[in-house]
């Protein structure tokens, strides 16, 4: 049940709406890129809440763009098919056999389900893969484990974005839902599995988004994990650069994505707790916000900091 349909008194409901007004005015007409993942993908309640949030953003004049991964669903399908899944340095090793499953699950299952849930509220969502219209371009990348370069197979890093198809959909009043599969630069017949956090950051920069919001399975960024009293509500890109080497491995891709987005001109980037229903709305439309927000050294006046 959403906050506005609970037993909250009428005056309190009115206060919630009035508090949201300046933020609606600030973000109306702008693009907000949302990376959807984690527990929010596997809980029916959280999936429903997320799709309601996207439709709400759409109806108050904001242009949401959804970027999704699908780690839990990929793991499940690989298990059903008896294909072993290997991780090195926290990243999935994607063999040609595994890549077929990744492609099938992201574009054919997760993306379609999300489009269907959004479209239960009206004909808004359109699903795309990073392959469509050469939306994303990627090159193969490895990782370093204990000082040794490791081959990850068909894993890539986004190096280019062709945003035209997304801009056309936004102009048509649609909500793009993007699966993070990308064609390999120089090899049109080869596709790569790209990290959804970094893909979302690249899209946010290319679309000149006002916000990047990444859903995660923790309350935000902690200065001294697992000390929950060390939760950081906001920090500058300078502070994040200094903190990045000391972060837990699971947060590094997310915070690196936030850093790249803000460095690329996105006004604000946030990680929010996707385990909490409607955390997106709290982050965008309340003064206190939700989670951890990254801002530039000298942000525009009148925005959340």
Swiss-Prot record:
A molecular function GO annotation: ATP binding
CDD domains documented for this protein: AAK_NAGK-C
EC code: 2.7.2.8
Enzyme's top EC category: transferase
Marked site: Transition state stabilizer: 35, 254
Pathway(s) annotated for this protein in UniProt: Amino-acid biosynthesis; L-arginine biosynthesis; N(2)-acetyl-L-ornithine from L-glutamate: step 2/4
Alphabetized UniProt keyword annotations: Amino-acid biosynthesis, Arginine biosynthesis, ATP-binding, Cytoplasm, Kinase, Nucleotide-binding, Transferase
UniProt KW Kinase keyword: yes
Residues that coordinate or bind substrate: 70-71, 92, 193
Domain of life, source organism: Bacteria
Subcellular location per the Swiss-Prot or TrEMBL entry: Cytoplasm
Keyword Transmembrane in record: no
Family to which this protein belongs: Belongs to the acetylglutamate kinase family. ArgB subfamily.
Protein name, entry field: Acetylglutamate kinase
């Amino acid at each position: 049940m959403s906050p506005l349909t609970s037993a909250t008194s009428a005056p309190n409901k009115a206060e919630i709406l009035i508090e949201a007004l300046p933020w609606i005015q600030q973000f109306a007409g702008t693009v907000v890129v949302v990376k959807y993942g984690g527990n929010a993908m596997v809980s029916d309640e959280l999936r429903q809440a997320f799709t309601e949030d996207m439709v709400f953003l759409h109806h108050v004049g904001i242009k949401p763009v959804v970027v999704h991964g699908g780690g839990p669903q990929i793991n499940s399908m690989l298990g059903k098919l008896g294909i072993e899944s290997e991780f090195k340095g926290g990243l999935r090793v994607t063999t040609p056999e595994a890549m077929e499953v990744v492609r099938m699950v992201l574009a054919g299952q997760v993306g379609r389900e999300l489009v269907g849930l959004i479209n239960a509220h009206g004909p808004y969502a359109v699903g795309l893969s990073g392959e469509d219209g050469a939306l994303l371009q990627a090159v193969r990348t490895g990782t370093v484990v204990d000082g040794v370069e490791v081959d990850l197979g068909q894993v890539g890093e986004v190096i280019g974005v062709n945003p035209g198809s997304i801009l056309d959909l936004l102009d048509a009043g649609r909500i793009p839902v993007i699966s993070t599969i990308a064609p390999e630069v120089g090899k049109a017949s080869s596709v790569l599995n790209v990290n959804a956090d970094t893909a979302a950051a690249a899209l946010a920069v290319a679309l000149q988004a006002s916000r990047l919001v990444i859903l995660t399975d923790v309350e935000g960024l902690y200065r001294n994990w697992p000390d929950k009293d060390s939760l950081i509500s906001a920090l500058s890109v300078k502070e994040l650069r200094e903190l990045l080497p000391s972060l837990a491995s699971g947060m590094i891709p997310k915070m690196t994505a936030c850093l790249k987005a803000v460095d690329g001109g996105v006004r604000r980037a946030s990680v929010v707790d996707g385990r909490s229903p409607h955390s997106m709305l709290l982050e965008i439309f309340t003064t206190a916000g939700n989670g951890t927000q990254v801002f530039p050294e000298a942000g525009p006046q009148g925005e959340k900091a």
